């Protein structure tokens, strides 16, 4: 799960495994595998960084 900021400035928590694609048009649009779309303030690169950080965190054995 990653925490992002919706365009309404409220926190949105998204399951990163369910992300199908990320587009910038000019705001960032995240499309999930089920077709739901989320507009967020973070850039695509920031979203990717959050996904990588989350995956590193869940693969770190000290959290198990």
Language-model features, listed with the residues they occupy:
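Eukaryotic intrinsically disordered, low-complexity regulatory linkers and tails enriched in Ser/Thr/Pro
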Residues: 1-13, 17-64
